[in-house]
Amino acid sequence: MVTYIVFVLSIIFVISFVGVSSKPSPIYGGLGLIVGGGAGCGVVLSFGGSFLGLMVFLIYLGGMLVVFGYTTAMATEQYPEVWVSNKVVLGAFILGLVVESLIVIYALKSGEVKIVFEFDGLGDWVIYDTGGSGVFSEEATGIAALYSYGVWLVIVTGWSLFVSVVIIMEITRGN
């Protein structure tokens, strides 16, 4: 059940960044980043990293709220452009949603996406401990699993941060 919750949060994460990449107005771009950050924190929390998820939520989203609050105040429009006001932007948004939907359908029909994520064989992530004060720390094991099994997660996270910086530079640059 948790696997499917993470799967749904990952879908929300990707769809929010599709919305960011086809942003018509800074308000909606910031909203997409906030939703994507919240979904990413939900994924971190579902794997037991409560402290890490809380820190990401407080620091990353707090900083984003300040930046996007400032840029929204500087670029306020009386009638902000929405996704349906420009046919090219709407087409890019719908194309991204269709591609994401096809990936989801493929993953649900085959049971796995071989490159990124498998729905079976997650026993490697389980920490076998007898209880009490164990030898293994959950956070350290999570970091080891992130860099061994989650190499694609690290790549996607780095790419997302790069795209976020480019979008922030584009928003603050102006006309």
Curated annotation (Swiss-Prot):
GO biological process terms on file: mitochondrial electron transport, NADH to ubiquinone; mitochondrial respiratory chain complex I assembly
Please give the superkingdom of this protein's source: Eukaryota
Tell me where in or outside the cell this protein is found.
Mitochondrion inner membrane
Q: Which UniProt keywords apply?
A: Electron transport, Membrane, Mitochondrion, Mitochondrion inner membrane, NAD, Respiratory chain, Translocase, Transmembrane, Transmembrane helix, Transport, Ubiquinone
How the protein sits in the membrane? Answer: Multi-pass membrane protein
Q: Which GO terms describe its cellular component?
A: mitochondrial inner membrane
EC number(s) for this protein? 7.1.1.2
Please list the reactions this protein catalyses: a ubiquinone + NADH + 5 H(+)(in) = a ubiquinol + NAD(+) + 4 H(+)(out)
Molecular function in Gene Ontology: NADH dehydrogenase (ubiquinone) activity
Which residue ranges does UniProt annotate as crossing the membrane?
1-21, 25-45, 47-67, 88-108, 149-169
This chain's function reads: Core subunit of the mitochondrial membrane respiratory chain NADH dehydrogenase (Complex I) which catalyzes electron transfer from NADH through the respiratory chain, using ubiquinone as an electron acceptor. Essential for the catalytic activity and assembly of complex I.
Q: Which family does it belong to?
A: Belongs to the complex I subunit 6 family.
Q: How does it assemble?
A: Core subunit of respiratory chain NADH dehydrogenase (Complex I) which is composed of 45 different subunits.
Q: What is this protein called in UniProt?
A: NADH-ubiquinone oxidoreductase chain 6
